[in-house]
Design a protein with these regions (language model features):
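N-terminal secretory signal peptides that target proteins for export/translocation
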Residues: 1-3
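Boundary at the C-terminal end of the N-terminal hydrophobic targeting segment
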Residues: 21-25
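Generic alpha-helix initiation/capping and coil-helix boundary signal
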Residues: 5-6, 176
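Non-catalytic cap/lid and distal C-terminal segments of serine-dependent acyl enzymes
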Residues: 30, 36-55, 59-64, 69-274
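Bacterial N-terminal signal peptides
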Residues: 6-18
Length: 274
């Protein structure tokens, strides 16, 4: 099953917007967090009036950083400056790690709960949303005979794919340990990166298939014997289930010279074993 009518979903949501806005007018204003300042420092805020201790941890600081509460129970602190990049972070409230409720940009992951903050540079990053033609992301579900369950895929198609007829090369891009099929787009921004590379003639138009790399719950370390077994299961599912689904529903070139596979962490190991 393929979810194509993204625009329809968005338009349907718009019908509900006036009602939701009306209801929100009676609510207290949200706490703005994070705020990226001009000097590339970041101000984090969290409303937690009943908490006794709140910290924040980021990848541009070392260790947990304490926040200070005001009279209304809003904890805040400013960290950095940080080098331009996209960083995960989370709050630790009385010892419990939580994502930032004021930030819709979430790091998709099975274990840790983190939000994302982008520190812009003087020049747009390769993953920035630029004024170029953009491709589409399609969320799909397929029946896995190998695992005997329904499994997700995220598939990128390049600009002009919907109106075209040409078959295209395909890259199978596998998620890392504890990551999901959404991590490559929501964190890696691979769709915007390829949009920009295609526009700059630095990459050919291609389709990217992003499967959920976890073949079993409780993923073992990549060095264990169980991990090698999991790599074999991934190879079987790729050949038996994923490739036939993709080749039946998308205009991909099915010969080995036009197929590639890559991955991060666990996904890198799965790619090498395929």
């Amino acid at each position: 099953m393929i979810w194509r009518p993204v625009l329809t979903i968005v338009l349907s949501a718009c019908w509900l917007l006036p009602v939701r806005v009306q209801a929100q007018r009676t609510q207290a204003p949200a706490v703005e967090s994070p705020v990226v300042n001009a000097d590339r420092t970041v101000t984090f805020r969290l409303k937690a009036p009943n908490a006794s201790k709140v910290e924040v941890t980021t990848q541009f600081t070392k260790g947990n950083q304490p926040l200070t509460a005001d009279s209304e129970g809003i904890w805040s602190g400013t960290l950095g400056p940080a080098e331009p990049n996209l960083y995960p972070y989370n709050f630790i409230v009385d010892g419990v790690a939580v994502a930032d409720p004021g930030n819709p940009d979430i790091f998709p992951n099975e274990r840790f709960k983190s939000s994302l903050v982008e520190i812009p540079g003087d020049q747009p990053a390769i993953y920035a949303v630029k004024d170029v033609p953009h491709g589409e992301l399609t969320r799909c579900y397929y029946a896995s005979k190998t695992l005997k369950r329904t499994r997700p895929l995220v598939i990128y198609t390049p600009p002009g794919y919907r109106a075209g007829t040409e078959r295209l090369p395909v890259l199978y891009l596998v998620s890392g340990t504890t990551d999901t099929e959404e991590t490559w787009t929501k964190v890696g921004r691979v769709n915007f990166t390829l949009d920009n590379l295609i526009a700059e003639k630095r990459a050919v138009p291609m389709i990217i298939v992003m499967p959920y790399g976890n073949m079993m719950m409780g993923t073992p370390p990549p060095t264990s014997i169980q991990a090698a077994d999991m790599y074999k299961v991934f190879n079987e599912e790729l050949v038996t289930d994923i490739l036939p689904f993709v080749e039946s529903n998308f205009r991909v070139l099915a010969d080995r010279e036009k197929r590639a596979i890559a991955g991060f962490s666990r996904g890198g190991g799965q790619s090498l074993f395929t």
